[in-house]
Amino acid sequence: MSKDTISNMITSIRNGNLSKAKIVQIPATQTARSIAKILLDEGFIENFREVVISDKNYSLLTLTLKYQGRTREPYITTLRRISKPGLRSYSSYQDIPKVMGGMGIVILSTSQGIITDRQARQRRIGGEVLCYIW
């Protein structure tokens, strides 16, 4: 398992979507909670909850993935990690890219927490571009 929790989360969700899994479990971190809340608010996942394993002093986030139709096509088509530990990517609020002509979202890490591209433009703040989702 890698030390990059964001890449680990994105890879777990992508693998869950490819195998059409109902739930995905990832290690619970503050960053993972913030990203899961954004995914829930934007309608990309059905639900998430934190499961505390008391005997090991460890907690997991359980994400319930969302699918559409009888063919169970995932709502998340693509997840792409942008800023990596070896190559950080920052953007001012004017230069935040629009994903799929505004159909997708960009998740940014800012001084005001982890927020979407729309929230960053409204608040007029830039930050580190974490990932694209559509």
UniProtKB/Swiss-Prot annotation:
Gene Ontology CC: one annotated term: ribonucleoprotein complex
InterPro entries associated with the record: Ribosomal_uS8, Ribosomal_uS8_CS, Ribosomal_uS8_sf
Gene from which the chain derives: rps8
Broad class of the protein's primary localization: plastid
Function: One of the primary rRNA binding proteins, it binds directly to 16S rRNA central domain where it helps coordinate assembly of the platform of the 30S subunit.
Record text on subunit structure and interactions: Part of the 30S ribosomal subunit.
Keyword terms, alphabetized: Chloroplast, Plastid, Ribonucleoprotein, Ribosomal protein, RNA-binding, rRNA-binding
Family: Belongs to the universal ribosomal protein uS8 family.
Species classification: Eukaryota, Viridiplantae, Streptophyta, Charophyceae, Charales
Single Gene Ontology MF annotation: structural constituent of ribosome
NCBIfam families per the UniProt record, alphabetical: PRK00136.1 (NF001109)
GO biological process: translation
Location(s), subcellular: Plastid, Chloroplast
Source taxon at top rank: Eukaryota
Protein's recorded name: Small ribosomal subunit protein uS8c
